[in-house]
Amino acid sequence: MKGNLAFIDRTVFKKGNILFFFFLIVCFFSRLNLQIFFIDIFSHLGFQILIGGILLFFILLFLKRFWASVICVFVCIVFAADILSSCNHCNAVLKDRSQIQNKLRLINFNISYNNSAKNFENIREMILSEKPDVVQFQEFSPQMHDKIKTLRSIFPYSTELNKPKGPFDSLILSKHPLTNTKVDDNHVVITNLTLNEVEISIVGVHLLAGGTKKNFNNALQQISYLKTIVKNTNKNLILLGDLNMTPTSKRFAKFLKETNLYTYTSYKNITSTWPAFMPNFLGIQIDHILFSNNFKMIDKKITNSFGSVHRPLIVELSY
């Protein structure tokens, strides 16, 4: 018994070992697409786990743990390679701008329900300067909803602008006519936009965060419902909203593959949308604008948060 305790003390509680073993366990489980809510959380933090592994490497060097530091570097390399290669639908960027024919500029902004309506004037100025064709708002209070209505002169078309909205509902504003609008009970908005003689289906959605078992299961049901919508929608499709998934997540990569939707992710020009109070390079992107394969991304950026815990995501597409 004493020998076993001594072995545990040497291997587990030796300086740096707890952090080292925790890092290995997190790396392993975060790359599995398990239907377990507390493990799923780690899958969305791939970039942060990698940064933690690099910091751990220097800690192990400081503690003179040579072999542990070597293993740590090796795991970091394998982990980074898996992150970079896991999403085959995250590379839809237009490299040759001479191919641009038609453009569509979109903004998705989770305003945050508790955001003061006093911040709307700055939000309005941002929208005017970015000149989008389509704007989607999410998580807005009744007071902020009243402010959004003042944009009617700029965006004359909308998805039921005058109807009351819940905290997880979406509201789409457009400069171009919207037809066949449908708002359902799954926090999903579906509408059609015709631009340059091309009909485009736009789906706005707010997926629940998987922080609890109940919310995680509800989010999986929403994803299953979205797959059905995408399957029954025309080939020109844009899906946007707070998806509560990051590009490093296996669940996100699987969703893109099964719906045949695309996006563009750059780890050089990071666009973290949440949480806005953290530096961009430490945050995560949970707000997305996804599209079918006949679109390509021209530009993607974020701006100031204007009192929200999310940053607005701005994307320009070519089609």
Q: Model regions: which residues?
A:
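N-terminal signal-anchor transmembrane helix
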Residues: 62, 70-129
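Soluble catalytic domains of enzymes that build or remodel membrane lipids, polysaccharides, and related
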Residues: 106, 113-128, 137-319
